[in-house]
Structures are given as structure tokens and as C-alpha cells.
């Protein structure tokens, strides 16, 4: 039996792959095993079990089996709860015969140590709550005896475990349980060893795939427009900035800086009213727009991000409400046409909404 155990252990070690032998931390597994169960110290005596019983061969080697449920706390420590059928051992004599059988529920700590990426050695230490049953038949007298006993015995095991895949593993296990049964009740108090080959399925071993990060939203290009009155920026019919106009542009520059205009573009649009020739008004609107650009560049706006454009008399705000058609305008008409004399600053690529300065 020892040669068989060594051969199986070597065979398992030869199947090394990259799978992990130990389950992931804080996961559960379940399995079953089948193997050879052997009883030791099987002398029968006491409480009606006379010396003549079992005067023939005692079949100490029997088929054993079991099932288990385990919890893997970490790579090195797990806990197992299992059921073992230790086998039915008949003892046969020429006249007297009988049988002894045992089964139990075990609870043990499993201590593992990896010797390869896919192979662990381990020991299990714990106890077994067992039930032992026996019966005897006396051919000469026709007497039949049967009884059972229960108790707790220490349990120890050693083994190797090999990971077939992430979820499946197999193990070779050699287990020892001492003093099963009370001799005064069931006529024997044997020890038991079981060499078994088991297979287990481990839950929760698949790698958790993190969801793909949501794509960054596409930048929203927006256009913000600021309108400054030309009468605040310039004297009538002039393109040189007044002190009051510079103060208004200082306020505007503060807001443009907070908006980070490097990420966008700035267009300064100059407008005039309809008083005067088209050619003159076009030139005046260009000069006024350029004056604003030059001042903002001097404050720190990159020159390649800002441009000037003269719009002349285009896009009049007042329309026909002021009654001016051509020629010399009255003072009242000049005052009425003031909204047409303006500078508009168009900022593209800036999403934040800001409040335009008051002129």
C-alpha cells in the first residue's frame, strides 16, 4: 500500500501546469474520495465476545469512501467538514463469525504549502465523531450478539493536491483515526487508516473581469459671445481705447483667463452704426476690433489664438427704429444708434458659462 501511495504521488507531480493548486482566498469547495480503508489492532474481546470468535481470517482491508465540504481562508489555511465510510470488516471462523463497521463525520483544519504553482502538500488535523457497529454469530450455541457505540477520536492526515484547472483539483490523501469503538460494547477498539484518491470542485475561481472604463465624453465645443459697447471703449468716431474701455477689457480678460482660452479661439468683431460711408465704417470697425485684440494680447492672450474682424454696418441691432436713413444724424439719432456701435468677442471651445462684464 505504501508503494502505491508513492507511485500515485509521483504521477500527480508529473502533470504540473500553470494552474494554482490552492483555491482563491475566501472561497468554498466540495469533493468526494474513494480508497482503501484498513483496520489495525482488531483483537475482539469482552462483553460476550468470547476468545473463540474470529478464529478464522479477519478482512482488515476494505473499500472506504467519503465526501467533504471545505472553506479556503487563504493560500495556507482551510477548513473541511466531511463524512467518511471506513468500511465493513468481516471476521470469519470455522464456527463463529461476525462483522465490524464504522463511519463518521470529521472536522479538520487543512494546512497547505505550495511546492509548485499547481501542486501543494498538506496536512489535516482535527477530530472525527464516529459510530461503530458490530455483530457476532456463534454457530455452536446459535447465539447472536450485536451492538453499536459512538465517540470522538483524533484525526490526522497528510497528502498532496494537484490543480487540474482553476475549478477542478485532485488529491492523494492518507488519513489516520485512532481508537474507534469501545471494546466493552462492540468487542473491538481498532485504529483506522485510509488511503484515498479524491476530486474537488472549487467555487468562485474565475477571474473577475473589471468593466471597461466608459469612454471619455467627446469635448463639447461651444461658442460664447460677449458684447461691449463702443461708447464705453472708444470716443465717438475714434478707435483708440479710453481708460474706461481698458477697465472693461481688464474685467473681460480676467474671465477669459479663468476659461483658459488656450484651448479655444477668440474672434473680436467690430461694428459701427450706419452714419457715414460704408467704406469709412468698415475701416473704423476693423481698427476698433484690432485695438481690442492688441490690448488683450498685451494682457497675455496668445496672439495665435485671437483675431480681429471688421463688420462695418452689418447686423444692426436697432434696425429702422431710430429713423436714420442717410446724411447727417441728429444727436437723438446718434444716441438711438448707440447699440449698433459695439464690439463683440466670440470665444469658441469653452464650455463654462460666464457672466459678461458690464460696460
UniProtKB/Swiss-Prot annotation:
Which superkingdom heads the taxonomic lineage of this protein's source?
Bacteria
Which terms are listed as keywords in the entry? Cell outer membrane, Disulfide bond, Ion transport, Membrane, Porin, Repeat, Signal, Transmembrane, Transmembrane beta strand, Transport
Annotated site residue numbers, Part of salt bridge gating mechanism: 80, 171
Annotated GO molecular function terms are: porin activity
- The record's disulfide annotation reads 322-336
Query: Which CDD domains did the record assign?
Result: OmpA_C-like
Name where the sequence repeats lie. 210-211, 212-213, 214-215, 216-217, 218-219
Q: Please report the record's description of how this protein sits within the membrane.
A: Multi-pass membrane protein
| Cell location | Cell outer membrane
Q: What is its main location?
A: membrane
Start and end residues of each stretch annotated as 5 X 2 AA tandem repeats of A-P: 210-219
Q: What is a single cellular component term in the Gene Ontology annotation? A: pore complex
Tell me the GO BP annotations in alphabetical order: monoatomic ion transmembrane transport
Q: Which InterPro entries match?
A: Bact_OuterMem_StrucFunc, OMP/PagP_b-brl, OMP_bac, OmpA, OmpA-like, OMPA-like_CS, OmpA-like_sf, OmpA-like_TM_dom
**UniProt-listed Gene3D superfamilies:** 2.40.160.20, OmpA-like domain
Q: What is known of its domains?
A: The extracellular loops are most variable in sequence, and in some bacteria confer sensitivity to phage and/or colicins.
User: What name appears for this protein in its UniProt entry?
Assistant: Outer membrane protein A
The organism named in the record is: Serratia marcescens
- Provide the organism lineage as a comma list: Bacteria, Pseudomonadati, Pseudomonadota, Gammaproteobacteria, Enterobacterales
The gene it comes from is ompA
Amino acid at each position: 500500500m505504501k508503494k502505491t501511495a508513492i507511485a500515485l504521488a509521483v504521477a500527480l507531480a508529473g502533470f504540473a501546469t500553470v494552474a494554482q493548486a490552492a483555491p482563491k482566498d475566501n472561497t468554498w469547495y466540495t469533493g468526494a474520495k474513494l480508497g482503501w480503508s484498513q483496520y489495525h489492532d482488531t483483537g475482539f474481546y469482552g462483553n460476550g465476545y468470547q476468545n473463540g470468535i474470529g478464529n478464522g481470517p479477519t478482512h482488515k482491508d476494505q473499500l472506504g469512501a467519503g465526501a467533504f465540504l471545505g472553506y479556503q481562508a487563504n493560500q495556507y489555511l482551510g477548513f473541511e467538514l466531511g463524512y467518511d465510510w471506513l468500511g465493513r470488516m468481516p471476521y470469519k471462523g470455522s464456527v463463529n463469525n461476525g462483522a465490524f463497521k464504522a463511519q463518521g463525520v470529521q472536522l479538520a483544519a487543512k494546512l497547505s504549502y505550495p511546492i509548485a504553482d499547481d501542486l501543494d502538500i498538506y496536512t489535516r488535523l482535527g477530530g472525527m465523531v464516529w459510530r461503530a457497529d458490530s455483530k457476532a454469530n456463534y454457530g455452536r450455541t446459535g447465539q447472536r450478539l450485536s451492538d453499536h457505540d459512538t465517540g470522538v477520536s483524533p484525526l490526522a492526515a497528510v497528502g498532496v493536491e494537484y490543480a487540474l484547472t482553476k475549478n477542478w483539483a485532485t488529491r492523494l490523501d492518507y488519513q489516520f483515526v485512532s481508537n474507534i469503538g469501545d471494546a466493552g460494547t462492540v468487542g473491538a477498539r481498532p485504529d483506522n487508516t485510509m488511503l484515498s484518491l479524491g476530486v474537488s470542485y472549487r467555487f468562485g475561481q474565475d477571474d473577475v473581469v473589471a468593466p471597461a472604463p466608459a469612454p471619455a465624453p467627446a469635448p463639447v465645443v461651444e461658442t460664447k459671445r460677449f458684447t461691449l459697447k463702443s461708447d464705453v471703449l472708444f470716443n465717438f468716431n475714434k478707435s483708440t481705447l479710453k481708460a474706461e474701455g481698458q477697465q472693461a477689457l481688464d474685467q473681460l480678460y480676467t474671465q477669459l483667463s479663468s476659461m483658459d482660452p488656450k484651448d479655444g479661439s477668440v474672434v473680436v468683431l467690430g461694428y459701427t452704426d450706419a452714419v457715414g460711408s460704408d467704406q469709412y465704417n468698415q475701416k473704423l470697425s476693423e481698427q476698433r476690433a484690432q485695438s481690442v485684440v492688441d490690448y488683450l494680447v498685451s494682457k497675455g492672450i496668445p496672439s495665435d489664438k485671437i483675431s480681429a474682424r471688421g463688420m462695418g454696418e452689418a447686423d444692426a441691432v436697432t434696425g429702422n427704429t431710430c429713423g436714420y436713413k442717410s446724411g447727417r444724424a441728429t444727436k437723438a439719432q446718434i444716441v438711438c444708434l448707440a447699440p449698433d456701435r459695439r464690439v463683440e468677442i466670440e470665444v469658441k471651445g469653452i464650455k463654462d458659462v460666464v457672466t459678461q462684464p458690464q460696460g
